[in-house]
């Protein structure tokens, strides 16, 4: 099953850009989970429901890594849970290197891990700058 996740930091922000990107990828609206709250942690009800629903072979699509969250350590941990424990794949639309369906060999995994760590760091740094 293919799922999408959308997060905006506040009720005033518009989620349409993310919804359109997921629809263009082929995610049906009923499989899109959305939270309207900060990405500082993963205590988000719809995100939790989505992760609980993921099964081996499922696909989670997000527009960008900062939509997943803005805490470096927690982004890495959630990535591990989804890809290693749940055995689901992740696609980050604005970063093709973060497509776990591709390059599952050692080099591909290494590149994806490096890019993920860098982008997770940037997401947390941006959150700290916003405060």
Q: What is each residue range found by the language model?
A:
Residues 7-14, 35-47, 54, 63-77, ...:
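Acidic, metal-coordinating catalytic cores used for nucleic-acid/nucleotide bond scission
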Residues 66, 81-84:
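Conserved RecA-like helicase motor core of SF1/SF2 enzymes
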Residues 21, 74-81, 114:
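Alpha-helical scaffold elements adjacent to nucleotide-binding pockets in ATP/GTP-utilizing enzyme cores
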Residues 1-3:
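Extreme N-terminal starter segment of soluble prokaryotic enzymes
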Residues 8-9, 83-131:
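Phosphate/pyrophosphate-binding and catalytic-coupling "lid/hinge/switch" segments at subdomain interfaces
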Residues 22-37:
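Short beta-strand elements in bilobed, periplasmic/extracellular small-molecule ligand-binding domains
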């Amino acid at each position: 099953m293919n799922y999408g996740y959308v997060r905006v930091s506040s009720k005033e922000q518009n989620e349409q850009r993310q919804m359109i990107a997921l629809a263009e990828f082929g995610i049906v609206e009923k499989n899109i989970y959305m939270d309207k709250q900060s990405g500082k942690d993963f205590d988000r009800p719809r995100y939790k429901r989505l992760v609980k629903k993921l099964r081996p072979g499922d696909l989670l699509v997000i527009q960008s890594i900062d939509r997943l969250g803005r805490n470096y350590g927690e982004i890495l941990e959630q990535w591990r849970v989804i890809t290693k424990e749940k055995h689901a794949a992740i696609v980050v639309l604005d970063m093709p290197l973060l497509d776990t369906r591709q390059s599952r060999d050692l080099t591909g995994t290494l590149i994806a891990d490096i890019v993920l760590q860098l982008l997770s760091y940037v997401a947390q740094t941006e959150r700290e700058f916003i405060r």
